A protein has these predicted regions:
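Mobile cap/lid helix-loop segments that border enzyme active or cofactor-binding sites
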Residues: 1-64, 92, 186-212
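Alpha-helical scaffold segments that form or flank carboxylate-/histidine-based iron centers
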Residues: 33-38, 64-79, 109, 145, ...
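Short alpha-helical scaffolding segments that buttress acidic/His motifs in well-ordered protein cores
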Residues: 39, 53, 69-74, 104, ...
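N-terminal hydrophobic signal/anchor transmembrane helix of membrane proteins
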Residues: 69-86, 152-169, 192-202
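Acidic/His metal-coordination segments adjacent to aromatic residues that form catalytic metal sites
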Residues: 104-115
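Acidic/histidine-rich alpha-helical segments that form the ligand environment
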Residues: 116-157
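C-terminal end-helix/capping segment
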Residues: 169-197
Length: 212
């Protein structure tokens, strides 16, 4: 990536509460500090995202691991490299394996997902790309796998990350540029600046291909 198109707000210019959130981002990830340091230009936007993300992505009634699969599906389909090279530590602890992130754009044919995960990913696909031809079958599948509270929460989480990632991919930001020295939530092969550079120069790098 080249030069950032919107600068990072220096940590020392933030108030104490915002600094605490930035340290949490560095310590826990998803999101990593760089995107939050851009949002810090508009504190109302910073907190609107941070509070909403905590409430509907990190917390709630729907399985967190499913929400993270959908988050990375969106990364792959809109090609947001900054977000797509992160993994939720909570989702990994819940049992998600790296191979399940690798096959997201082929989820319907993949053996790496169960029916509930595939239904959730079809929801993410529809939010990103539009309703499939058989609308009744689409909704029947979702209702067979999720309660209505889960569908609302999951839909809001997907919609939030879809909008944010569609914006973040334009910014030119990358990892290990702000509050460097931590690797929380970084995907394998991206945990240091050197690893990140090597992985992104590989012909097998996921973003080297086409989206969707």
């Amino acid at each position: 990536m080249g030069k950032n198109h919107i600068s990072y707000v220096p940590l020392e210019q933030m108030d104490e509460r915002m600094q605490e959130e930035m340290h949490r981002c560095a310590r826990e990830g998803t999101p990593r500090p760089e995107s939050s340091a851009v949002r810090a230009h508009a504190p109302n936007a910073f907190w609107a995202f941070a509070d909403s993300w905590k409430a509907i992505f990190h917390s709630g009634v729907c399985d967190h691991a499913i929400k993270d699969l959908c988050r990375v599906y969106i990364s792959r389909t809109v090609k947001c490299e900054f977000c797509g090279n992160q993994r939720s530590e909570k989702a990994i602890k819940a049992g998600l394996e790296e191979m399940q992130y690798d096959d997201l754009l082929n989820f319907e044919k993949s053996e790496h997902y169960d029916e509930r995960q595939k239904a959730a990913l079809s929801y993410a696909e529809a939010i990103a790309w539009g309703m499939p031809a058989d609308e009744d079958a689409f909704w029947a599948r979702l209702h067979a796998n999720f309660s209505e509270p889960e569908l609302v929460e999951l839909g809001c989480a997907i919609a939030l990350t879809f909008g944010q990632q569609s914006w973040i991919r334009l910014l030119g930001i990358d990892h290990h540029q702000y509050m460097a020295g931590t690797d929380a939530s970084m995907a394998p092969g991206f945990r240091t600046a050197e690893e990140l550079a090597a992985s992104k120069s590989s012909p097998d790098y996921w973003a080297a291909g086409s989206a969707r």
